[in-house]
From Swiss-Prot:
Keywords: Allergen, Disulfide bond, Hemostasis impairing toxin, Platelet aggregation inhibiting toxin, Secreted, Signal, Toxin
Name of the molecule in the record: Long form salivary protein D7L2
Gene this chain is encoded by: D7L2
Domain of life: Eukaryota
Keyword Disulfide bond among record annotations: yes
Function: Modulates blood feeding of female mosquitoes on vertebrate species by binding and sequestering different mediators involved in the host response, such as biogenic amines and eicosanoids. Binds serotonin, histamine, adrenaline, leukotriene C4, leukotriene D4, leukotriene E4, arachidonic acid and U-46619, a stable analog of thromboxane A2. Does not bind noradrenaline, leukotriene B4, ATP or ADP. Inhibits agonist-induced platelet aggregation and hemostasis.
Organism field: Culex quinquefasciatus (Southern house mosquito)
Principal location listed in the UniProt entry: secreted
Molecular function as annotated in GO: IgE binding; odorant binding; toxin activity
Amino acid sequence: MNFVGISSLVIVAFFAGGNAAWKPFSPEETLFTYTRCMEDNAKGDLALAKKWMAWKLEADQKSACYAKCVLVGLELFDESSKTFKGDHIVEQYQKYKSYTSQDEAGVKKFQQAVQALGTIDSANCLKVLQKYGPVHAQFTDVQRNVYFGKKEITDKIYNSDYTVKKRDETMFRFCERSNFKDGSEELCTLRKTGITTNNNHLDCLFRGLRYLDRNGNINPDEIKRDLHFINVKDKDAAVDNALNNCKVKEATKATDYNDCLWKDPNLKDIMMPVFDYREVRSESYRYFIENTDPYDVAKVKEKVKKYDKDAGC
Protein backbone atom coordinates (compact mmCIF):
# COMPACT_ATOMS: atom_id res chain seq x y z
CA MET A 1 0.00 0.00 0.00
CA ASN A 2 2.99 2.17 -0.09
CA PHE A 3 5.99 2.62 -2.27
CA VAL A 4 9.69 1.94 -2.44
CA GLY A 5 12.32 4.45 -3.49
CA ILE A 6 10.02 7.42 -3.14
CA SER A 7 12.94 9.85 -3.33
CA SER A 8 13.54 8.71 -6.88
CA LEU A 9 9.91 8.51 -7.89
CA VAL A 10 9.17 10.57 -10.95
CA ILE A 11 6.11 12.67 -11.38
CA VAL A 12 3.78 12.81 -14.31
CA ALA A 13 1.76 15.96 -13.91
CA PHE A 14 -0.92 16.00 -16.57
CA PHE A 15 -4.00 17.65 -15.17
CA ALA A 16 -7.12 17.65 -17.30
CA GLY A 17 -10.11 19.84 -16.63
CA GLY A 18 -13.79 19.27 -16.21
CA ASN A 19 -15.95 16.65 -14.59
CA ALA A 20 -15.09 13.96 -17.10
CA ALA A 21 -15.33 10.20 -16.73
CA TRP A 22 -13.02 8.51 -14.24
CA LYS A 23 -9.36 8.76 -15.18
CA PRO A 24 -6.50 6.55 -14.02
CA PHE A 25 -4.17 8.07 -11.46
CA SER A 26 -0.84 9.35 -12.72
CA PRO A 27 2.41 8.71 -10.82
CA GLU A 28 2.26 12.34 -9.66
CA GLU A 29 -1.16 11.80 -8.14
CA THR A 30 -0.25 8.60 -6.33
CA LEU A 31 2.99 10.14 -5.06
CA PHE A 32 1.10 13.15 -3.75
CA THR A 33 -1.35 10.84 -1.99
CA TYR A 34 1.38 8.74 -0.37
CA THR A 35 3.42 11.69 0.84
CA ARG A 36 0.47 13.77 2.01
CA CYS A 37 -0.82 10.79 4.01
CA MET A 38 2.66 10.35 5.48
CA GLU A 39 2.87 14.04 6.31
CA ASP A 40 -0.49 14.01 8.07
CA ASN A 41 0.02 10.79 10.00
CA ALA A 42 3.76 10.39 10.68
CA LYS A 43 3.87 14.00 11.91
CA GLY A 44 7.65 14.34 11.74
CA ASP A 45 8.45 10.73 12.68
CA LEU A 46 10.84 9.93 9.82
CA ALA A 47 11.58 6.43 11.13
CA LEU A 48 7.88 5.58 10.95
CA ALA A 49 7.54 7.12 7.49
CA LYS A 50 10.47 5.01 6.28
CA LYS A 51 8.63 1.88 7.42
CA TRP A 52 5.71 2.89 5.24
CA MET A 53 8.09 3.59 2.37
CA ALA A 54 9.28 0.01 2.78
CA TRP A 55 5.66 -1.22 2.52
CA LYS A 56 5.59 -2.20 6.18
CA LEU A 57 2.22 -1.64 7.80
CA GLU A 58 1.97 -2.51 11.46
CA ALA A 59 -1.27 -2.57 13.42
CA ASP A 60 -0.71 0.70 15.28
CA GLN A 61 -3.00 3.73 15.14
CA LYS A 62 -0.73 5.92 12.99
CA SER A 63 -0.03 3.18 10.45
CA ALA A 64 -3.70 2.31 10.27
CA CYS A 65 -4.68 5.92 9.62
CA TYR A 66 -1.94 6.22 7.01
CA ALA A 67 -3.27 3.10 5.28
CA LYS A 68 -6.84 4.37 5.36
CA CYS A 69 -5.74 7.77 4.02
CA VAL A 70 -4.05 6.12 1.04
CA LEU A 71 -6.99 3.82 0.37
CA VAL A 72 -9.35 6.78 0.37
CA GLY A 73 -6.99 8.85 -1.77
CA LEU A 74 -6.67 6.11 -4.39
CA GLU A 75 -10.43 5.55 -4.26
CA LEU A 76 -10.07 1.97 -3.01
CA PHE A 77 -12.18 2.76 0.05
CA ASP A 78 -15.22 5.03 0.21
CA GLU A 79 -15.40 6.51 3.68
CA SER A 80 -19.00 7.70 3.46
CA SER A 81 -20.38 4.26 2.61
CA LYS A 82 -17.62 2.36 4.48
CA THR A 83 -17.17 0.25 1.35
CA PHE A 84 -14.06 -1.09 -0.36
CA LYS A 85 -14.00 -0.33 -4.09
CA GLY A 86 -12.14 -2.27 -6.75
CA ASP A 87 -14.08 -0.86 -9.69
CA HIS A 88 -11.18 0.88 -11.42
CA ILE A 89 -8.20 -1.32 -10.54
CA VAL A 90 -8.05 -3.07 -13.92
CA GLU A 91 -8.61 0.23 -15.73
CA GLN A 92 -5.74 1.75 -13.74
CA TYR A 93 -3.51 -1.16 -14.71
CA GLN A 94 -4.41 -1.05 -18.40
CA LYS A 95 -3.46 2.63 -18.71
CA TYR A 96 0.17 1.95 -17.75
CA LYS A 97 0.58 -1.79 -18.38
CA SER A 98 3.24 -1.23 -21.05
CA TYR A 99 5.57 0.01 -18.31
CA THR A 100 5.30 -3.09 -16.13
CA SER A 101 5.64 -6.85 -16.46
CA GLN A 102 2.58 -7.35 -14.27
CA ASP A 103 0.12 -9.83 -15.77
CA GLU A 104 -3.56 -8.93 -15.97
CA ALA A 105 -4.65 -12.16 -14.28
CA GLY A 106 -2.89 -11.09 -11.09
CA VAL A 107 -4.51 -7.67 -11.26
CA LYS A 108 -7.96 -9.21 -11.63
CA LYS A 109 -7.34 -11.40 -8.58
CA PHE A 110 -6.35 -8.29 -6.64
CA GLN A 111 -9.48 -6.51 -7.83
CA GLN A 112 -11.68 -9.44 -6.83
CA ALA A 113 -10.04 -9.57 -3.40
CA VAL A 114 -10.71 -5.87 -2.81
CA GLN A 115 -14.30 -6.13 -4.02
CA ALA A 116 -14.88 -9.12 -1.76
CA LEU A 117 -14.08 -7.00 1.31
CA GLY A 118 -17.41 -5.27 0.83
CA THR A 119 -18.81 -2.91 3.44
CA ILE A 120 -17.62 -2.71 7.03
CA ASP A 121 -19.49 -1.43 10.08
CA SER A 122 -16.97 1.27 10.95
CA ALA A 123 -14.57 3.55 9.06
CA ASN A 124 -12.27 3.59 12.09
CA CYS A 125 -8.63 3.45 10.94
CA LEU A 126 -7.82 0.23 12.77
CA LYS A 127 -10.98 -1.44 11.49
CA VAL A 128 -10.11 -0.48 7.91
CA LEU A 129 -6.56 -1.81 8.15
CA GLN A 130 -7.70 -4.95 9.95
CA LYS A 131 -9.99 -5.71 7.02
CA TYR A 132 -7.59 -4.69 4.26
CA GLY A 133 -4.40 -6.03 5.85
CA PRO A 134 -4.60 -9.59 4.47
CA VAL A 135 -5.22 -8.27 0.94
CA HIS A 136 -2.28 -5.91 1.27
CA ALA A 137 -0.04 -8.75 2.43
CA GLN A 138 -1.09 -11.06 -0.40
CA PHE A 139 -1.00 -8.50 -3.22
CA THR A 140 1.78 -6.12 -2.21
CA ASP A 141 3.70 -6.65 -5.44
CA VAL A 142 0.60 -6.19 -7.58
CA GLN A 143 -0.20 -2.95 -5.78
CA ARG A 144 3.32 -1.67 -6.39
CA ASN A 145 3.00 -2.50 -10.08
CA VAL A 146 -0.41 -0.90 -10.50
CA TYR A 147 0.04 2.18 -8.29
CA PHE A 148 3.64 3.14 -9.12
CA GLY A 149 5.53 1.62 -6.23
CA LYS A 150 8.63 0.69 -8.22
CA LYS A 151 11.32 3.03 -9.46
CA GLU A 152 11.92 0.99 -12.60
CA ILE A 153 8.32 1.58 -13.65
CA THR A 154 8.31 5.30 -13.04
CA ASP A 155 11.74 5.69 -14.66
CA LYS A 156 10.30 4.32 -17.89
CA ILE A 157 7.47 6.83 -17.77
CA TYR A 158 9.90 9.62 -16.97
CA ASN A 159 12.04 8.77 -19.98
CA SER A 160 9.22 8.39 -22.50
CA ASP A 161 6.36 10.75 -21.58
CA TYR A 162 6.64 14.38 -22.68
CA THR A 163 4.24 15.45 -19.92
CA VAL A 164 6.60 14.26 -17.20
CA LYS A 165 7.37 16.72 -14.43
CA LYS A 166 11.12 16.60 -13.95
CA ARG A 167 12.82 15.44 -10.78
CA ASP A 168 13.31 18.31 -8.37
CA GLU A 169 11.18 20.63 -10.47
CA THR A 170 8.59 22.79 -8.76
CA MET A 171 4.96 22.53 -9.79
CA PHE A 172 5.12 26.21 -10.71
CA ARG A 173 8.06 25.76 -13.08
CA PHE A 174 6.47 22.67 -14.60
CA CYS A 175 3.28 24.52 -15.46
CA GLU A 176 5.24 27.56 -16.62
CA ARG A 177 7.36 25.50 -19.00
CA SER A 178 4.20 24.15 -20.57
CA ASN A 179 2.61 27.57 -21.11
CA PHE A 180 5.28 30.29 -21.37
CA LYS A 181 8.63 30.95 -22.96
CA ASP A 182 11.34 31.34 -20.35
CA GLY A 183 12.37 34.96 -20.00
CA SER A 184 9.19 36.28 -21.58
CA GLU A 185 7.64 39.45 -20.20
CA GLU A 186 4.39 37.61 -19.48
CA LEU A 187 6.14 34.93 -17.44
CA CYS A 188 8.27 37.38 -15.49
CA THR A 189 5.24 39.54 -14.73
CA LEU A 190 3.44 36.44 -13.48
CA ARG A 191 6.31 35.48 -11.20
CA LYS A 192 6.38 39.02 -9.76
CA THR A 193 2.64 39.55 -9.36
CA GLY A 194 0.93 36.15 -9.33
CA ILE A 195 -1.49 37.40 -11.99
CA THR A 196 -1.94 36.10 -15.54
CA THR A 197 -4.78 35.64 -18.01
CA ASN A 198 -3.32 32.32 -19.18
CA ASN A 199 -6.01 29.95 -17.91
CA ASN A 200 -4.20 26.84 -19.13
CA HIS A 201 -1.31 27.69 -16.84
CA LEU A 202 -3.51 28.47 -13.86
CA ASP A 203 -5.60 25.34 -14.38
CA CYS A 204 -2.39 23.29 -14.39
CA LEU A 205 -1.15 25.08 -11.29
CA PHE A 206 -4.38 25.01 -9.30
CA ARG A 207 -4.76 21.30 -9.97
CA GLY A 208 -1.13 20.67 -9.14
CA LEU A 209 -1.50 22.54 -5.85
CA ARG A 210 -4.82 20.75 -5.23
CA TYR A 211 -6.65 24.07 -5.03
CA LEU A 212 -8.87 22.36 -7.60
CA ASP A 213 -9.60 18.70 -6.97
CA ARG A 214 -9.69 15.90 -9.54
CA ASN A 215 -13.22 16.92 -10.52
CA GLY A 216 -12.33 20.57 -10.93
CA ASN A 217 -14.01 21.72 -7.71
CA ILE A 218 -12.41 24.43 -5.60
CA ASN A 219 -10.79 23.16 -2.40
CA PRO A 220 -10.73 25.96 0.21
CA ASP A 221 -9.11 23.75 2.86
CA GLU A 222 -5.96 23.33 0.77
CA ILE A 223 -5.64 27.09 0.36
CA LYS A 224 -6.13 27.66 4.08
CA ARG A 225 -3.54 24.98 4.81
CA ASP A 226 -0.98 26.94 2.81
CA LEU A 227 -1.81 30.11 4.73
CA HIS A 228 -1.36 28.27 8.02
CA PHE A 229 2.11 27.13 6.95
CA ILE A 230 3.28 30.74 6.73
CA ASN A 231 1.76 31.32 10.18
CA VAL A 232 -1.32 33.15 8.92
CA LYS A 233 -4.15 31.54 10.85
CA ASP A 234 -6.70 34.33 11.04
CA LYS A 235 -7.68 34.55 7.37
CA ASP A 236 -9.79 31.41 6.93
CA ALA A 237 -12.98 33.46 6.79
CA ALA A 238 -11.38 35.79 4.25
CA VAL A 239 -10.57 32.82 2.00
CA ASP A 240 -14.14 31.55 2.25
CA ASN A 241 -15.51 35.00 1.55
CA ALA A 242 -13.27 35.56 -1.47
CA LEU A 243 -14.16 32.20 -3.00
CA ASN A 244 -17.87 32.30 -2.20
CA ASN A 245 -18.27 35.75 -3.74
CA CYS A 246 -16.11 34.98 -6.75
CA LYS A 247 -17.86 35.21 -10.12
CA VAL A 248 -16.64 32.11 -11.91
CA LYS A 249 -17.05 30.93 -15.47
CA GLU A 250 -16.35 27.28 -16.23
CA ALA A 251 -14.00 28.14 -19.10
CA THR A 252 -11.87 30.45 -16.95
CA LYS A 253 -12.42 28.91 -13.52
CA ALA A 254 -8.80 28.84 -12.39
CA THR A 255 -8.14 32.41 -13.57
CA ASP A 256 -11.27 33.68 -11.88
CA TYR A 257 -10.45 32.07 -8.55
CA ASN A 258 -6.83 33.22 -8.76
CA ASP A 259 -7.92 36.81 -9.38
CA CYS A 260 -10.38 36.69 -6.50
CA LEU A 261 -7.68 35.51 -4.10
CA TRP A 262 -4.92 37.84 -5.24
CA LYS A 263 -7.13 40.93 -5.48
CA ASP A 264 -9.04 40.45 -2.24
CA PRO A 265 -8.13 43.30 0.15
CA ASN A 266 -7.69 40.86 3.04
CA LEU A 267 -5.49 38.44 1.10
CA LYS A 268 -3.57 40.40 -1.55
CA ASP A 269 -0.55 41.02 0.68
CA ILE A 270 -0.13 37.39 1.74
CA MET A 271 -0.72 35.48 -1.49
CA MET A 272 2.85 35.97 -2.73
CA PRO A 273 4.47 34.50 0.41
CA VAL A 274 1.87 31.73 0.31
CA PHE A 275 2.79 30.87 -3.29
CA ASP A 276 6.53 31.26 -2.66
CA TYR A 277 6.53 28.75 0.20
CA ARG A 278 4.29 26.34 -1.68
CA GLU A 279 6.63 26.52 -4.67
CA VAL A 280 9.58 25.58 -2.47
CA ARG A 281 7.66 22.66 -0.97
CA SER A 282 6.39 21.47 -4.36
CA GLU A 283 9.97 20.78 -5.43
CA SER A 284 9.85 17.67 -3.26
CA TYR A 285 6.68 16.07 -1.95
CA ARG A 286 8.79 14.74 0.90
CA TYR A 287 9.48 18.26 2.15
CA PHE A 288 7.55 18.05 5.41
CA ILE A 289 8.40 14.38 5.92
CA GLU A 290 12.12 15.16 6.07
CA ASN A 291 12.19 18.86 6.96
CA THR A 292 11.02 19.91 10.41
CA ASP A 293 12.51 23.42 10.33
CA PRO A 294 10.01 26.24 10.93
CA TYR A 295 8.97 28.58 8.14
CA ASP A 296 11.84 30.95 7.33
CA VAL A 297 10.88 33.71 4.92
CA ALA A 298 14.52 34.61 4.14
CA LYS A 299 15.38 31.04 3.13
CA VAL A 300 12.23 30.82 1.03
CA LYS A 301 13.08 34.02 -0.81
CA GLU A 302 16.57 32.72 -1.59
CA LYS A 303 15.10 29.57 -3.11
CA VAL A 304 12.57 31.56 -5.14
CA LYS A 305 15.39 33.72 -6.54
CA LYS A 306 16.89 30.53 -7.99
CA TYR A 307 13.55 29.60 -9.55
CA ASP A 308 13.25 33.13 -10.99
CA LYS A 309 16.72 32.80 -12.50
CA ASP A 310 15.80 29.41 -13.96
CA ALA A 311 12.77 31.09 -15.54
CA GLY A 312 14.96 33.77 -17.06
CA CYS A 313 13.43 36.49 -14.90
